[in-house]
């Protein structure tokens, strides 16, 4: 089975324009989270869309699904997320297992709730690649020169930009593989390894690159929100 896991566990309101976490802010005439879920509803191979939210916001998320996506709510599961990204993925996979016991071939397409401009092509590419590789990371080629500094004051290295990519989401992998690899980490490693695909990489797994889009914006600042609103208006 193919599942989607939407990471919507953040509670930050650092934009300072609302007391709502950013995934619940309005974009156009609907919350950002709803825009994101809608993209996954369009892919018929996805059995369930599991949304991991902070426990304080579970009821609110359920109300939004009832209001904006009543025809699709049977495909959507709202569950309590974890304290960080990887524990939220773990909680999402546990919710999938509760819905239907996991098989070794079950795949989850994980995605940031605040990337509402994901395309159907990106979702389908992730699913296709995950069937032949251990994991998939969605990326775009680095446009700006990236510099490295180990002390925050002086440049220690300028890597070759031709070899660099900017990570986005989705990140896709088999549910059981993630659970096994995450379970094998020490507590210290879990603190350091906040990116799911990095866990696969350090464990020597095959992580394929899926082509992202520069329009696959992650809305984390007021400027991001302004850009997203202009993109919605153009559509």
UniProtKB/Swiss-Prot annotation:
The site feature described as Positions ribitol 5-phosphate for the nucleophilic attack is recorded at: 161, 218
| Primary enzyme class | transferase
InterPro entries cross-referenced by the UniProt entry: IspD/TarI, IspD/TarI_cytidylyltransf_bact, ISPD_synthase_CS, Nucleotide-diphossugar_trans, TarI
Annotated pathway:
Cell wall biogenesis; poly(ribitol phosphate) teichoic acid biosynthesis
GO molecular function terms here? 2-C-methyl-D-erythritol 4-phosphate cytidylyltransferase activity; D-ribitol-5-phosphate cytidylyltransferase activity
Keywords attached to this Swiss-Prot or TrEMBL record, sorted alphabetically, are: Cell wall biogenesis/degradation, Nucleotidyltransferase, Teichoic acid biosynthesis, Transferase
| Residues of the site described as Transition state stabilizer | 14, 22
Query: Pfam families under this entry?
Result: IspD
Q: Which family does it belong to?
A: Belongs to the IspD/TarI cytidylyltransferase family. TarI subfamily.
NCBIfam families documented for this protein: PRK00155.1-3
What's its job? Catalyzes the transfer of the cytidylyl group of CTP to D-ribitol 5-phosphate.
Q: What protein is this chain from?
A: Ribitol-5-phosphate cytidylyltransferase
Organism field: Streptococcus pneumoniae (strain ATCC 700669 / Spain 23F-1)
The organism's taxonomy opens as:
Bacteria, Bacillati, Bacillota, Bacilli, Lactobacillales
């Amino acid at each position: 089975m193919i599942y989607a896991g939407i990471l919507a566990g953040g509670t930050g309101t650092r934009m300072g324009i609302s007391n709502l976490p950013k995934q619940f802010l309005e974009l156009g005439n609907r919350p950002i989270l709803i825009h994101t879920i809608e993209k996954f509803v369009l892919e018929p191979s996805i059995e369930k869309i599991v949304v991991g939210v902070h426990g304080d916001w579970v009821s609110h998320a359920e109300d939004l699904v009832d209001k904006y996506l009543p025809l699709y709510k049977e495909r959507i599961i709202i569950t309590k997320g974890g304290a960080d990204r990887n524990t939220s993925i773990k909680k999402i996979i546990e919710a999938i297992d509760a819905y239907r016991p996991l098989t070794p071939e079950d795949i989850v397409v994980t995605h940031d709730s605040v990337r509402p401009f994901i395309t159907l092509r990106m979702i389908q590419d992730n699913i296709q690649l995950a069937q032949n590789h251990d994991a998939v990371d969605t990326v775009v080629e680095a446009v700006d020169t990236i510099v490295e500094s180990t002390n925050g004051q002086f440049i220690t290295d300028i890597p070759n930009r031709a070899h660099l990519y900017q990570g986005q989401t989705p990140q896709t992998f088999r549910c059981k593989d993630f659970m096994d690899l995450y379970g094998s980490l020490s507590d210290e490693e879990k603190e350091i390894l906040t990116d799911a695909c990095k866990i696969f990489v350090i464990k020597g797994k095959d992580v394929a690159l899926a082509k992202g889009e520069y329009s696959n914006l992650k809305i984390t600042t007021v400027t991001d929100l302004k850009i997203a609103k202009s993109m919605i208006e153009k559509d």
